[in-house]
Amino acid sequence: MAFRCQRDSYAREFTTTVVSCRPAELHTEESNGKKEVLSGFQVVLEDTLLFPEGGGQPDDRGTINDISVLRVTRRGTQADHFTQTPLTPGTEVQVRVDWERRFDHMQQHSGQHLITAVADDLFGLKTTSWELGRLRSVIELDSPTVTAEQVAAIERSVNEKIRDRLPVNVRELSLDDPEVEQVRGRGLPDDHAGPIRVVTIESVDSNMCCGTHVSNLSDLQVIKILGTEKGKKNKTNLIFLAGNRVLKWMERSHGIEKALTALLKCGAEDHVEAVKKLQNSSKLLQKNNLNLLRDLAVHIAHSLRNSPDWGGVITLHRKGGGEASWRSWAACNFPAPFAAWSQVCALCFRKDGDSEFMNIIANEIGSEETLLFLTVGDEKGAGLFLLAGPAEAVETLGPRVSEVLEGKGAGKKGRFQGKATKMSRRAEVQALLQDYISTQSAEE
């Protein structure tokens, strides 16, 4: 038996009766990947206006007596409606469909049928699957390549048929009807029961389908094929929009074009060239900046070596463009194995820099005999850190430094580096290093 939504895709509300209501759970996944389990009820109605997911088409949204329906799934000849409020069996209820979502799905699904038929008719390109996405839809074609000329020809043809206002009819055929063998289709579900539903675009295509469709191609308004992408092995994905999605896409594209025109100070026809020039300038600036940072790293390393406090524990604190300020901790005479160290040095902070910047400093100073704690990034936020020095000390201190800075890192061969989220706790790391040295001295 076809549901009301399949018999009349344009119906927006109707009255029916609750058959059953049982406790259930709904597993959801947000766009950010977060998963959630909702407690609620599966409600079965005598008939439904809400389409259950199937045939590549997502399910409808809507309400039952103003209670939101969060999911609709098919179970044999019945449709389960998930709600978070129970409904009493035998109660007469009013069902309303989210018409914007429904009509969008009708446009995309009928658009897919049309593109599939035309691609096959013009070039023998067979559709193997399709997906009705939230923003765009994808048709998988059984061909390793589809040329730009073929795409343009398909787009011209489908829009001509839309302008011809071709009717779209829905019929039901029995399983033993000879016509079943002549219609396009990818098989029936294992639990299918009853007649076969066939959607026909007059003079274009007949296709087995359970989905909701427009009654005339004119309701598609327009189809825009955005292009193709490489699909699975020997397959090509054709990306398209139909109907209102094309209008939204044009509105969004025009808004972006206006914004770029204002930012780039040129007309739309010059946007690409203007961006290329900006990219080239940016690459040159990045290259120059990298060279300057490398030179600065060498300069800082030499400045440390030449510091009057060399032999004690010193720090360099620099917030970016300002002058560096040096502070001496306390000169220490380190016993073996630390007596071989010429310095225990903490280069506390520089806002600008990267991992390479810190490693150049470590290489120039020579971390085999010097314990270095280097950081770059936001003084009170996130950044990068490097602990370098004798392997035994770094192996012991590295994970503890990472923990204090609430970061993640790894180390080998006398270097431990990583990302930190709490650069404001650098002073605690300095204290940790001092305590470690003091403890080693006491043990000696």
Swiss-Prot record:
Keywords: Cytoplasm, Metal-binding, Phosphoprotein, Protein biosynthesis, Zinc. The keyword Cytoplasm applies. It holds the Pfam family tRNA_SAD. InterPro entries: Ala-tRNA-synth_IIc_core, Alanyl-tRNA_Editing_Enzymes, Thr/Ala-tRNA-synth_IIc_edit, Transl_B-barrel_sf, tRNA_SAD. GO terms for biological process: alanyl-tRNA aminoacylation; regulation of translational fidelity. Functions in trans to edit the amino acid moiety from incorrectly charged tRNA(Ala). Belongs to the class-II aminoacyl-tRNA synthetase family. Alax-L subfamily. This is Alanyl-tRNA editing protein Aarsd1.
